[in-house]
């Protein structure tokens, strides 16, 4: 339940790099593949929580402390007993679950298709699970956390507000949930991550965000602004972007 170790992250990244070189397709396809590949928010204040932005190669996950999950999204944590932190990532269902990643399957990921969310539960700190250099923390108000969780919940396919595990994930402490939004070359794992942060009220743009680097740059900017504003009472909330 400690999440993907360094060897797993390296193996997944290496496998994806090989796919890109062999297929010469846009790096958007790697978003699906790279699924394989701290302190509690209370420290930030009783009325705030922490959002974790984790970069996993070409893919970015959005996470939070399991204790911060409220109904109905708390059902996701129930599927990962013992997890202290829960991370969500968006992907192309057909590609991610395909037995053979041949040309037709690779190409299909470019066009709108069914999505899936890989949900990972970890028992150690995110910085330990993914590497400190690959995790950005953002302080969120209660309203921001509520809006973020509402966005993630809307992304999940449920039956009568009940969330059911679709199947076990690729490593211990992970499960797949079916998603509602379509995955495509123009709406990738990283587009979804940007939409999640924007839903939480952060000033990020979402249109044209295809690659992890495009979202990572924005998350780093948010972190710098947060650090600068720490003693001034300034806010990172934004009404509009794009």
Where do the model's predicted regions map?
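Intrinsically disordered, low-complexity segments enriched in Ser/Pro/Gly/Ala and basic residues
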Residues: 7, 37-39, 234-240
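Bacterial N-terminal signal peptides
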Residues: 24-36
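Activation targets extended, charge/polar-rich intrinsically disordered C-terminal tails
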Residues: 154-242
